[in-house]
């Protein structure tokens, strides 16, 4: 992509009402534009990152055996009355009446819809287990939307729902999602700590939040320090028949709790050097809630004994759009965003220091075409802006690599390469730089 043809409305200063770093940088980098309180348009740069995060989530859900579908954003109020949540949900639910006076709502979550789909289709225990997931826009009418995409009213969410015959099967489904979450967050360069959490309006008796530690986190969290650096399990697991409980036990045996579930006495019993109290950002939340929805909505299957039994359910959410904010909060400097390569909007930014100079233009074109041919995503700044402005923009938008082409270097047969994360620069021939950049990505 050439900057001269791209839509990248960067700002020199963040609006005064942007309170946290991620909100400030997303606005300055031309990733989003606020259309109303808590509602944003996703501009091209932001959408590229959003799509990459969504794809990682999709790949890890598929790997863990979940099946994707797409549920409606507008839901029937009657379904929520069946579950008993319509009146309980409160003012966060946006309620709608259509021209026929039917009561509808803009879905804040989808337990009722997916249960309705399940009960119409699955009748026997032989068809279990099932895990259905959906990546869809949700709406919750927050009283005080703030912090940009971190606490907006409209947001993109992945929500998965498991259906099992009994509690043992439900726990296995829960464990699969628990481990899948560890992997998907690690692929985005995040250190997400699973913490025992309150179930809230979703319900159930087992729940974990996945928390990214950040000074701007909305809640206090408490955990054993070893959990922060514990590596992700990786993809090479037996997702169907393997026992994932030891992996879950490894993460849950050590103390970790959100503020609502915090046990100060148990936390203080840890050696002082092992205790970590911090602020955190919730990026995922998983629940096991038994028959909370299946019983009132009559989602039953015929068991091995021929009797009808309500299925055991769980739900598993990831804030896809919120993850952009969390990644920025965890990875930035005074110059701007530092994207992990796995989610960066482009892999490489080419900076032409003297647009219109024949030698510089030719070298940039060679690099641009070679990188694209190798499958790398490239943003080529071919504008007439000053060099300092080009550098500032590249640092702001956080591309992992910057390839800098100037007349002095070209005369000496070299170009400059800068690594955004470390700030390291070195010069080399264009051929050797391109050889390095066309190799496989790392996070």
UniProtKB/Swiss-Prot annotation:
It is an enzyme of class 6 (ligase). One of its GO terms (molecular function) is proline-tRNA ligase activity. GO terms for biological process: prolyl-tRNA aminoacylation. PROSITE patterns: AA_TRNA_LIGASE_II. The keyword Protein biosynthesis applies. It catalyses: tRNA(Pro) + L-proline + ATP = L-prolyl-tRNA(Pro) + AMP + diphosphate. It is found in: Cytoplasm. Pfam families: HGTP_anticodon, tRNA-synt_2b. Keywords: Aminoacyl-tRNA synthetase, ATP-binding, Cytoplasm, Ligase, Nucleotide-binding, Protein biosynthesis. The keyword Secreted does not apply. Its EC number is 6.1.1.15. GO terms for cellular component: cytosol. Homodimer. Belongs to the class-II aminoacyl-tRNA synthetase family. ProS type 2 subfamily. NCBIfam families: PRK12325.1 (NF008979), proS_fam_II (TIGR00409). Catalyzes the attachment of proline to tRNA(Pro) in a two-step reaction: proline is first activated by ATP to form Pro-AMP and then transferred to the acceptor end of tRNA(Pro). This is Proline--tRNA ligase. The lineage of its organism: Bacteria, Pseudomonadati, Pseudomonadota, Alphaproteobacteria, Caulobacterales.
